[in-house]
């Protein structure tokens, strides 16, 4: 009687350092994949505009039949980059939308707009392993005018890990520099937008950094 083979479940997580080619392991004939593209940076601001939050990276899930030893091209998107597995591609900026930053002079002061939530990899099939959505949008920066109207908050980043937009104090008769948006903190998240600057000579605010993507390969192999 032949001994039973042990079957091992694998969730293989790839980063940009793994870019190149991935070879199908021995005994593997089906692979379920989740691709998350990189999130976009939040926008800069100036004395006319608040920065919008960066859009999150797109999320793509699928299953393919494979054969051992066959190689597939792998590109894990860094910030603002697409993620690719073979012929499949998740697009940067196609995830949760970033919160809009109010544009143009002459608007009323307002808080930043929130970013949209991301999406669950594998359609939330494995919530114990991947409990949070990926590819959230960043929040927009606050829009102020220098009218002594108090503090305006930045938009909340989308769930999970979108960068928050920058808030700012609306104070009169001073130069107010734009403030930096918050950095994204989870796969595919967009950065937060910068708050609007006020008065001539004010410096622009910088948008927060997006977060890189990830590729996850799920398969069963012989132990």
Short names for language-model regions:
Residues 32-223:
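Low-complexity, glycine/proline-biased repetitive segments and flexible coils/loops
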Residues 1-32, 63, 214-223:
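Enriched but not universal
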């Amino acid at each position: 009687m032949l001994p039973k083979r042990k079957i091992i479940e694998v969730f293989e997580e790839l980063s940009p350092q793994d870019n190149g080619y991935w070879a199908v392991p021995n005994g593997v004939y089906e692979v379920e994949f989740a691709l998350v593209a990189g999130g976009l940076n939040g926008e800069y601001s100036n004395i006319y505009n608040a920065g919008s939050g960066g859009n999150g990276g797109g999320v793509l899930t699928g299953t393919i039949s494979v054969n051992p030893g066959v190689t597939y091209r792998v590109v894990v998107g860094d910030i603002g980059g697409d993620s690719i597995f073979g012929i499949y591609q998740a697009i940067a900026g196609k995830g949760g939308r970033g919160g809009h930053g109010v544009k143009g002079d002459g608007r009323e002061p307002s808080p930043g707009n929130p970013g949209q939530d991301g999406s669950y990899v594998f359609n939330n099939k494995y919530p114990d392993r991947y409990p949070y959505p990926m590819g959230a949008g960043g929040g927009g920066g606050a829009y102020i005018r220098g009218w002594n109207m108090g503090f305006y908050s930045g938009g909340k980043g989308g769930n999970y890990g979108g960068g928050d937009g920058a808030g700012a104090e609306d104070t009169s008769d001073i130069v107010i520099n734009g403030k930096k948006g918050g950095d994204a903190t989870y796969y595919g998240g967009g950065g937060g937008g910068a708050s609007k600057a006020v008065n001539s000579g004010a410096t622009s605010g910088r948008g927060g950094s997006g977060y890189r993507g990830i590729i996850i390969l799920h398969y069963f192999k012989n132990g």
